[in-house]
Amino acid sequence: MNQNIQKEYHISQDGSGDFRSLFEALSALQSSEFPEEANQAENLPAAPDFRSSGGDTEPVVLFLHAGIYRERIVILRPGITIIGDDPQTTVITGGLYARMPMEDIGKRGTFRTYSCLIAAHDITFKNVTFENSSGIGPDVGQALALYADGDRLVFENCRFLGNQDTLFTAPLPPKEIEANGFVGPGQKLPRVFGRHYYKNCYLEGDIDFIFGGATAYFENCELFSKYINRPVNSYVTAASTPQGQPYGYVMKDCRFTGNCPPHSAYLGRPWREYAKTVLLNCYIGEHICEEGWHDWNKEAAHENTLYAEYESTGPSSDMKKRPGWVKSLTPAEAAFYVKSLVLKGNDGWNPA
């Protein structure tokens, strides 16, 4: 490890810490390993892949003290833990959105709207809020609070605030459906197997506000669907699980809540036809449609997706009203979705 780099830093906007901004701290940590332009990435080059590059990987802890950090954050160095004072008072926020004009393709597009980008492995956040404040999906389009592209990522007691596409759990699918649909930092990077763990978090949005191809385990989280005055106000998840990947999204002991009228939101729909989303012991509020899940008009998804529930409770939890392609798990089948199995991969990862 570079002797000039401490193992811990404090970040405080009042100048009492080592840095005044998270951007400043990350730029200092990353400057010796990555080109300066990468610290402000719109598009990361295909090579090197920063997630697996060499350089300093000694664990570093950043204490992020209370404040509204109106910064665009890019994390490229592995082994960083960022601990906020409190998610109510420690906020990383931005306001970029997909319909913003851009010279190259005419608009910013989904994947250049992030307030925070993680393109590294072994990153942990605790007690921090990620926010995109740009507006509701029908008005501004997609707007990411967090673009999470890495393996062994942990988020504990965090909030994710936004509207359409609040949280992107990379990787991207192999191919675009629309031209220039993937323009952004991950477009040219190899698609990597990412495992994420979200514990005691609050996530909100309207359309597809948790989406992507990662294997992600959500435990004791609240998933809040926001009212946008539409017949369908919200789709909570839009997984794009790669074909052959054993796990997609697993929600355990989570609460699906919202301020939408009864039966005006869905638990999820398949961004790609091999999507996997499993609910274990979750509370399903009245705002969720009785059928629970939507097929996004993909007939092949009836055969290829996995949408499954075990011991759901709440007003919209009746499995008898779900479509035939939604599975009700037995206790033996539900045991396949314990955290230690879902996240273990080839290295036995099992975050506490």
Spans of features found by a protein language model:
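Sequence-level preference for short, compositionally simple segments enriched
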Residues: 2-352
